[in-house]
């Protein structure tokens, strides 16, 4: 029974791209389905996701980052040097509206997430290296994301880097630290919770995506062609 439940959880998690498309369609057709989630719930949802990620990490994971400093350093530098500049170039070349330009640059300035680790696992790549890169870039993002967003997007709209910094501390660093501590002192319960955390993370991401699309329905429908094109170019360029 437990094994079957685990298989269902993995299946539901691996179908994340499909759920994202379905949620996007529902949010644009029937916005009320997701507007209840609310802006204030986004930070809470992201915090829970980072808490779940922290519960899968141990002190050894942090030590492993330093065992391949050149590879990790190259990955982190590529993440924060190439992607933000690429996002800013796309926003400028495609003349995106200010809100979309800032959003694209912010996405380009963020670290890799847990979804990248899942993709590496499915591709039978080096999962340990992917986790190390995600961990290193997440830590670096505490300083780099506010700085780069302010630098590249500040002329579109006012960007408060210190507010971004404080938000990342509360939403990323604090729950991540709590999760690591939980795994350190209460490994059994952390292991049990970690079995469900990927699915919980997927559900929360879907709620966040659904709310954002529902909340910005008019803007998205008015600019869907240029928005879709810019996001696809950003991610294809990242690969």
Question: Positions of the model-derived regions?
Answer:
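Alpha-helical transmembrane segments of multi-pass small-molecule/ion transporters
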Residues: 1-239
């Amino acid at each position: 029974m437990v094994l079957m439940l685990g298989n269902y959880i993995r299946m539901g998690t691996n179908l994340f791209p499909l759920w994202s498309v379905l949620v996007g369609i529902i949010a644009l057709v029937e916005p009320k389905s997701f507007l209840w989630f609310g802006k204030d719930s986004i930070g809470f949802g992201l915090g829970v996701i980072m808490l779940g990620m922290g519960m899968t990490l141990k002190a050894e994971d942090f030590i492993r980052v330093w065992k391949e400093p050149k590879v990790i350093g190259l990955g982190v530098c590529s993440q924060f040097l190439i992607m933000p500049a690429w996002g800013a170039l796309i926003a400028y070349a495609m003349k995106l509206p200010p809100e979309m330009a800032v959003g694209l640059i912010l996405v380009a300035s963020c670290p890799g997430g847990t979804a990248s680790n899942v993709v590496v696992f499915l591709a039978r790549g080096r999962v340990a290296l992917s986790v190390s890169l995600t961990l290193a870039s997440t830590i670096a993002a505490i300083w780099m994301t506010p700085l780069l967003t302010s630098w590249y997007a500040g002329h579109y709209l006012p960007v408060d880097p210190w507010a971004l910094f404080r938000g990342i501390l509360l939403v990323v660093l604090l729950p991540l630290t709590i999760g690591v501590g939980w795994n350190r002192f209460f490994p059994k319960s952390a292991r049990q919770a970690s079995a469900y955390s990927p699915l919980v993370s997927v559900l929360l991401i879907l709620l966040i995506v659904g709310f954002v699309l529902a909340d910005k329905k008019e803007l998205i429908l008015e600019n869907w062609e240029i928005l879709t094109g810019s996001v696809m170019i950003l991610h294809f360029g990242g690969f």
